[in-house]
């Protein structure tokens, strides 16, 4: 019919339904880490995402736009995966992983022939892995009790029972894998391919600005150099002010 509806990469850069930083989780961090980059310098006093590794990573992502669905700026990342990749209209897509994807995808996308990689590799592997923590606060009235509770709920016995009902990544080496056989390698063979985000000062402001400039680069509103420079200047200004008061 003359209509192009087959693409190389299913992508969605609209953040109206999930927040700006989700596009960093889905697309940006992996490219940055795989090219040897990081968000912050090691001393956390300045950012490094606009160095040569960072520029190369974003330039590579920008180059993929010619292989994306034309409406990538108006779709969310999840809509792009379900409506483009899930419909069999793209060769590659990115979504959150789950230990039950083998089961749920068979129900949601019954005609889709799919497989997955946990991470691509350039200079290194690297894919976003969400990390949460239980924190013992200095104001806690009974620190021993709180620590005992943390150890209990993160221990193998409790988490084995919990994950039997709600499949998720094991927290300890002694906890057995629970989930689809197809997805097991994410948590066994590929566990060294995950990265967590660096914890640094002013993180929310820095990453929200970076996400906005990343959108601008991908949409063509600004160049790679200008977009990253704007995000870098904003971030380093915040960090200078933060550290001046320490």
Can you describe what each PLM-predicted range is?
Residues 1-47, 90:
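Extracytoplasmic/periplasmic solute-binding protein
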Residues 59, 63-67, 99, 105-168, ...:
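Extracytoplasmic/periplasmic substrate-recognition and gating elements
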Residues 1-16, 155-166, 238-246:
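Bilobed periplasmic-binding protein-like "clamshell/Venus-flytrap" ligand-binding domains
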Residues 72-87:
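Short helix-initiation/N-cap motifs at beta->coil->alpha
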Residues 91-96:
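Paired acidic/hydrophobic, glycine-rich loop segments that form the ligand-binding mouth/hinge
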